[in-house]
């Protein structure tokens, strides 16, 4: 079973739809309607932390899920979920140099990552965000796996745990190869 933690965002159901085409065994629960014990009792195969408004501190249980469950379950953070991963491990989430809502942008590979396997360098991805993980504050345990031409972090991963984040939206029609990323994550 795949658990999607919903950060009160309409994109959650785009994720649900695309993931359901890969594996229909999905449960969606809002970020303030479950506990760590609930998640452990569910025993999900994967956890996906959805996009959402605001910043990681406003994302219900998400920071604690990352801090406490990162070694127990593979975790993928999308947009706000990605930012939560950066913050949970000690990075700073700051205002992006440019607010980007509904724009396709080129994303360049920066390091090998199992979730970016078979993705071409310079793939198109949908961006909807005004915050980013600050590159200068990235903790030693995380590495950048993709970035923009302006060096904004677009994907990261933990160096020893199965924890991955993408700032862009793989579930968007403006990310033509987004299904590949989700399929790669679900194969872990």
Residue ranges, per PLM feature:
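Extreme N-terminal starter segment of soluble prokaryotic enzymes
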Residues: 1-3
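Two-component/phosphorelay signaling modules centered on CheY-like receiver
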Residues: 16-25
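Short hydrophobic/Thr-rich beta-strand motif most characteristic of the beta2 strand and flanking loop
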Residues: 25-31
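Short amphipathic alpha-helix with an adjacent loop that forms part of the alpha/beta core around
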Residues: 35-43
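Cysteine-nucleophile active-site neighborhood
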Residues: 44-113, 117, 182-184
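Histidine-centered divalent metal-coordination motifs
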Residues: 79, 129, 169
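Catalytic beta-strand/loop cores that center a nucleophilic Ser/Cys/Thr
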Residues: 113-161
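Acyltransferase
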Residues: 173-188
């Amino acid at each position: 079973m795949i658990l999607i933690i919903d950060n009160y965002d309409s994109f959650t159901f785009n994720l649900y739809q695309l993931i359901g085409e890969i594996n229909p065994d999905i449960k969606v629960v809002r970020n303030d309607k479950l506990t760590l014990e609930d998640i452990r009792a569910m025993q999900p195969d994967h956890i996906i932390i959805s996009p959402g408004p605001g910043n990681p501190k406003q994302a219900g249980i998400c920071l604690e899920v990352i801090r406490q469950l990162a070694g127990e379950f593979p975790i993928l953070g999308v947009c706000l979920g990605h930012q939560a991963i950066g913050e949970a491990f000690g990075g700073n989430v700051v205002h992006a140099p440019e607010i980007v809502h509904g724009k396709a942008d080129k994303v360049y590979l920066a390091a090998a990552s199992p979730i970016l396997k078979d993705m071409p360098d310079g793939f198109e991805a949908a961006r909807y965000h005004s915050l980013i993980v600050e590159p200068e504050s990235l903790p030693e345990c995380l590495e950048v796996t993709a970035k923009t031409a302006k060096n904004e972090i677009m994907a990261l991963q933990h160096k020893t745990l199965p924890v991955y984040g993408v700032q862009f939206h793989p579930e968007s029609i403006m990310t033509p190869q987004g299904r590949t990323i989700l399929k790669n994550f679900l194969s872990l």
